[in-house]
Each structure stands twice: as C-alpha cells, then as structure tokens.
Amino acid sequence: MNGPADGEVDYKKKYRNLKRKLKFLIYEHECFQEELRKAQRKLLKVSRDKSFLLDRLLQYENVDEDSSDSDATASSDNSETEGTPKLSDTPAPKRKRSPPLGGAPSPSSLSLPPSTGFPLQASGVPSPYLSSLASSRYPPFPSDYLALQLPEPSPLRPKREKRPRLPRKLKMAVGPPDCPVGGPLTFPGRGSGAGVGTTLTPLPPPKMPPPTILSTVPRQMFSDAGSGDDALDGDDDLVIDIPE
C-alpha cells in the first residue's frame, strides 16, 4: 500500500520541479532576448560608424588624388620651365648676310622724305634758319607804329551806344472790358541807367471783339416775374458766377 502513495508523491514533486524549471527557462529566455536587443543596437551603431568612416576616407582619398595631380602638373611645369632656358642657352646659328644688291633699296632709303624739302637734322643741333630768326639782324619796329597798330587793351570795356528801339506792337490778351488798355508802359532800361525806367508812348487801343462775358447781370434774372415756359423754372440751386 505504500507503493501507490509513494508514486503519487513522486508525480507531485516532478510537476513542481518541471514547473520550476519552466519558470527558470522563461526567465533565461527574457534575459537572452534583452541581450540580443543590446547586441543589435551595438551592431547598428557600428555599421553607422563604419559608413561614416568610409565616407571620410573617400574624401581624403579624393583630396590626395587632387594634390597628386597638382604636384604632377607643377612638376611638369617646372620641367618645362627648366627646359626652356636650356634651349635658350644654346646659341642660334648665325645666318650669313648676303651682300646688298645694287637694285635693292636699303632700309634707310625707305624712310619717307620730309614734306618741307629740307634735310632732317638731329634734334639737339639747332637749324641755321631758327638761329637766324633768333639773331637780331632786323631792327625792331618803331614804338609809334606799334602804338597805332596795337592799342593797349583798356581794363574796362567801352560802353556801346544803344540805338533807340522802335515801339513794338504788343499782343494784348482778350479780357473783360474793365481792364485798362491805354496808359504809359514802363520797361526797365539797360546799361548805365539800369535803375531808371524808360517810358514808351501809349499805343492806340486795338480793335477788340465784343466781350462774351457780361459785366452786369440782366435785370430779368433778379425779377420774380418770368415766362412760365422757362426751362430753368424750379431750379433753386442754380449758381451764377458774376465777374467782379
């Protein structure tokens, strides 16, 4: 009878042991999952750093290539500049000059002849013509002749006598009849008497057309009595401008 009881006790223990192991496995699984997430984060960070470093390395390689190209061009330029003086140092072979032929004109004869017909002279040597002019070969002109021919200019200019101006016909603008037309007209004078005005004789009044603007208002406008057929009847807001 102890056997079956012992068997039941064993099953319970096994169940408890298995349950304990299962909990431990679940806990380990969660721990490993957390470790896996951390490892993935580190891997992502490392991959980003790798791409960044590769880009920087590519930039440095491009700069190195450009500098190497510039060094190569500079070295080629230096080699060219060094080669040119060597070529210039070697003297060029001199050509033998052929004797000038009789018919061929010389370069000195190709120069244009002077327009005056006299031979050209050096600039430093004075010509005899100029020296003869500079010498006092001829007597000077008499002072009386010079005074008659060339009078000394006076500091003040002589005032010119103005001719009397003829009266001009003035164009008068057409205006109201109240404007005076006749009367003496004064104009400022010029010259010495600038302050004194010169008077002109009055001109006869020109023939003017009859004025279109009435200086006086007709009495019919002020009268109350009027024709019944007037087109302006009942218009109290009528404004009439009366010229003063």
Swiss-Prot record:
Residues 157-171 have a biased composition (Basic residues). Its main location: nucleus. Residues 202-212 have a biased composition (Pro residues). Keywords: Coiled coil, DNA damage, DNA recombination, DNA repair, Isopeptide bond, Nucleus, Transcription, Transcription regulation, Ubl conjugation. Residues 63-236 are annotated as: Disordered. Residues 99-115 have a biased composition (Low complexity). GO terms for biological process: chromatin remodeling; DNA recombination; DNA repair; positive regulation of DNA repair; positive regulation of DNA-templated transcription; positive regulation of telomere maintenance in response to DNA damage; regulation of cell cycle; regulation of chromosome organization. Residues 10-54 form a coiled coil. InterPro entries: INO80E, INO80E_N. Pfam families: INO80E. It is found in: Nucleus. Component of the chromatin remodeling INO80 complex; specifically part of a complex module associated with the N-terminus of INO80. Putative regulatory component of the chromatin remodeling INO80 complex which is involved in transcriptional regulation, DNA replication and probably DNA repair. This is INO80 complex subunit E. It comes from Homo sapiens (Human).
